[in-house]
C-alpha cells in the first residue's frame, strides 16, 4: 500500500533548487515517506539537474506538472499549457529518467481550452508513454487557460471521469490514478473498484486530514487505532525536533493542521488558538498541544 505525500515546486523553485537554499526547499522528515516531488518546467536539462540535486534527499517519485492552469505558470511555459507540446513533455520525462531510478510520473488534465476531445488527451498520453512514463495522474477536467482563475478551473470545467477509464483501457499496463473532486474515502474506493489503479485526493484531505486515518479500513479492511490526540502529540514532537525556535515555520505548520478538528465541537476555538499571534510566540513548538488543550480540555 503506497500513500504518497506530494511536495510541489514551481518554476521559480526549480531555479532555486539549482541555485538556492536546497535544504529549505527539499528537506523533509523520514516518517513522511513515501514523498513525491512535483516539478514545473519545460527545459529538459534544468529538470534533469533538479532531479539530480533532489535525489540526495531521498524522494520516492518525481512528478512533472502538466495540469496547473494559472497565468503565472503559463508565463513560465509549464503546467497545463505543456499538454499542447507533448514532444516537449516527452523530452522532459526522458531527461528526468536519465538521472534517477525512481519513477518519473506526469499529472495532467483531460484537455486544454478547445482541445477537449478524447483523441487529444489519448495522443498526449501516448507520446509521453512512448518516452517511458508509466504512471499518469489524471485530473478529469479540462484546463481553460483564458478567463478562469485556478480556483474556477477546479470547479467550472465539467468533470468527465469516464476519460480516465478510457485511458486505462487504451494503456492497460500503465498505473492510472484519477484526481478531481474526490470528496470521501467511499468515493475513492468506488473508483478503485471500478478499475482505477489509485486516486489522488487533494482538497478534501487538506480540509479534513482526519479522513486519511480511515484509508486502511475503507480500502483494505484493516482497522486503525490512531487518535486525533496522538496526531497532536506527533506534530508537537515534529515541531520540537525541527522548528523549536522558528516562529515563521511554526505558524506555517499550524495553519496546515487547522482541519484536524473539523466537525468537532470546539473546532472554532482550536482554529482561533492556532492562528493567534500571541499564542504562536508564547507557546512556540508547544502551540498545537496548547491549542488542543484549550479547545478540548485534554492533552
Show the residue positions of the predicted features:
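Short gly/pro/ser/thr-enriched loop/turn and capping motifs at secondary-structure boundaries
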Residues: 14-15, 70, 144, 205-209
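Glycine- and other small-residue-rich loops at beta-strand/loop junctions that grip anionic moieties
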Residues: 39, 81, 85, 107, ...
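Single conserved hydrophobic/aromatic residue that forms the stacking wall/gate
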Residues: 1-13
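Alpha/beta catalytic cores of nucleotide-metabolism and tRNA/nucleoside-modifying enzymes
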Residues: 91-94, 99-101, 112-135, 159-178, ...
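Short, structured active-site "lid" loops
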Residues: 23-38
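Alpha/beta catalytic barrel-like cores
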Residues: 11-17, 50
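Alpha/beta enzyme core
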Residues: 48-62, 66-78, 87-174
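Hydrophobic faces of well-ordered beta-strands that scaffold small-molecule active sites
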Residues: 7, 35-39, 62, 104-108, ...
Amino acid at each position: 500500500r503506497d500513500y504518497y505525500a506530494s511536495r510541489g515546486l514551481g518554476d521559480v523553485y526549480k531555479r532555486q533548487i539549482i541555485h538556492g537554499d536546497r535544504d529549505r526547499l527539499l528537506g523533509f522528515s523520514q516518517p513522511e515517506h513515501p514523498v513525491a516531488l512535483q516539478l514545473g518546467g519545460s527545459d529538459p536539462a534544468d529538470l534533469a539537474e533538479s532531479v539530480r540535486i533532489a535525489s540526495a534527499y531521498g524522494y520516492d517519485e518525481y512528478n512533472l506538472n502538466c495540469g496547473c492552469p494559472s497565468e503565472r505558470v503559463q508565463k513560465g511555459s509549464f503546467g497545463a499549457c505543456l499538454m499542447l507540446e507533448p514532444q516537449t513533455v516527452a523530452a522532459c520525462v526522458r531527461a528526468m529518467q536519465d538521472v534517477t531510478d525512481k519513477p518519473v510520473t506526469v499529472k495532467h488534465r483531460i484537455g486544454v481550452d478547445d482541445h477537449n476531445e478524447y483523441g487529444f488527451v489519448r495522443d498526449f498520453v501516448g507520446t509521453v508513454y512512448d518516452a517511458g512514463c508509466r504512471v499518469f495522474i489524471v485530473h478529469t477536467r479540462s484546463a481553460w487557460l483564458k478567463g478562469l482563475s485556478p480556483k474556477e478551473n477546479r470547479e467550472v470545467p465539467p468533470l468527465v471521469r469516464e476519460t480516465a477509464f478510457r485511458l486505462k483501457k487504451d494503456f492497460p499496463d500503465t498505473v492510472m490514478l484519477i484526481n478531481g473532486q474526490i470528496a470521501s474515502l467511499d468515493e475513492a474506493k468506488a473508483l478503485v473498484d471500478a478499475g482505477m489503479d489509485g486516486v489522488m485526493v487533494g482538497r478534501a484531505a487538506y480540509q479534513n486530514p482526519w479522513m486519511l486515518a480511515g484509508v486502511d479500513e475503507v480500502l483494505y479492511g484493516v482497522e486503525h487505532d490512531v487518535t486525533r490526540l496522538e496526531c497532536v502529540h506527533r506534530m508537537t514532537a515534529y515541531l520540537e525536533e525541527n522548528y523549536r525556535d522558528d516562529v515563521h515555520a511554526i505558524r506555517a505548520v499550524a495553519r496546515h493542521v487547522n482541519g484536524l478538528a473539523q466537525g468537532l465541537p470546539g473546532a472554532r476555538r482550536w482554529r482561533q488558538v492556532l492562528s493567534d499571534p500571541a499564542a504562536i510566540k508564547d507557546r512556540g513548538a508547544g502551540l498545537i498541544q496548547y491549542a488542543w488543550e484549550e479547545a478540548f480540555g485534554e492533552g
